[in-house]
């Protein structure tokens, strides 16, 4: 009887590890197909600013080495006689160029721009998706790069989706005085809660115990537990002013996360709810509303 029960237990453990590894490979391996993750259809023609970066001739390729010795890539776009900098941080499965519209706007406002490729994305090295946790340390290195070049720099961070998760996780670190303000657009509370939501909505699967096993895999392979990648915990230590933005029809990073993030934030803060807009569409669909609020919020600090 004992042998039978032990065998059943072992089979269940193996099945759970298999499911968890499949989840890890699907969600956190940057090289695996992400087909089916984003189901929203966008039939809108791209605006000039959405593709502007591809034709911009004066962008400079720059590289840093991460704390774990990955070669990370970014673009710098200079503006003469300006100490203002915007670091635009892209989302899950994207790359630096996907922040073209943000870069275009800030550049038109007289900012220098740094557009990093997050680890495992674009031209940056990396074999896993950091969900913002290790990425936060990478952004700190990018901040240092700017300050070394311009000690009087005033730096703004603006992230979308996973990029928003990243800049919120940056907010809980000891930041140099040069970092003045943060904009987060449709970010999540934590990697664990986000994946639990996606498991439920996409696959009709429970988070327990699948995410526990998946988190063990991320620790073994990538050196972080999913529970560590928490914007909530980092926001509780934040000192830099933060603007929170979320579309109320977001079905990928659920809208209810906005208030959880906002309430957790210990620094000066404001929020913008964008009506009838889905995931990561606030800027493109309600551009005037979006930028009026952003410019109003950042003005006292930049």
Where are these regions (language model features)?
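An N-terminal hydrophobic leader/cap segment in hydrolases
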Residues: 4-65
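The serine-hydrolase catalytic nucleophile loop
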Residues: 92-105
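Short alpha-helix in the alpha/beta-hydrolase fold that links the catalytic acid
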Residues: 102, 231, 240, 254-263
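Conserved alpha/beta-hydrolase
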Residues: 106-125
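Alpha/beta-hydrolase active-site loop
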Residues: 129-150
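Hydrolase active-site cap/lid region
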Residues: 169-224
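Short beta-strand/loop motif that positions the catalytic acidic residue
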Residues: 237-239, 244-246, 250
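Catalytic active-site module of serine/aspartate enzymes centered on a nucleophile-bearing elbow/loop
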Residues: 285-302
């Amino acid at each position: 009887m004992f042998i039978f029960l032990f065998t059943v237990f072992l089979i269940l453990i193996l099945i759970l590890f298999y499911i968890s590894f499949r989840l890890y490979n699907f969600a956190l391996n940057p090289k695996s197909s992400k087909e089916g993750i984003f189901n929203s259809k966008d039939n809108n023609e791209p605006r000039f600013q959405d593709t502007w970066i591809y034709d911009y001739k004066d962008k400079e390729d720059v590289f840093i080495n991460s704390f774990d010795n990955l070669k990370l890539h970014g673009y710098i776009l200079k503006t003469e006689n300006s100490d203002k900098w915007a670091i635009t941080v892209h989302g899950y499965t994207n790359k630096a160029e996907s922040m073209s519209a943000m870069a275009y706007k800030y550049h038109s406002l007289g900012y220098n721009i740094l557009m990093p490729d997050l680890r495992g994305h674009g031209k940056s090295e990396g074999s896993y998706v950091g969900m913002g946790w290790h990425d936060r340390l990478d952004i700190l290195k990018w901040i240092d790069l700017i300050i070394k070049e311009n000690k009087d720099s005033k730096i703004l961070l603006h992230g979308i989706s996973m990029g928003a998760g990243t800049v919120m996780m940056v907010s809980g670190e000891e930041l140099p005085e040069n970092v003045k303000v943060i904009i987060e657009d449709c970010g999540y509370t934590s990697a664990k809660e986000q994946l639990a939501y996606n498991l439920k909505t996409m696959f009709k699967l429970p988070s327990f115990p699948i995410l526990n096993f998946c988190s063990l895999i991320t620790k073994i392979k990538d050196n972080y537990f999913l529970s560590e990648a928490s914007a909530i915990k980092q926001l509780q230590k934040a000192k830099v002013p933060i603007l929170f933005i979320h579309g109320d029809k977001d079905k990928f990073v659920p809208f209810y996360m906005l208030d959880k993030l906002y309430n957790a934030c210990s620094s000066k803060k404001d929020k913008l709810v964008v009506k009838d807009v889905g995931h990561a569409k606030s800027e493109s669909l309600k551009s005037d509303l979006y930028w009026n609020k952003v410019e109003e919020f950042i003005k006292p600090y930049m």
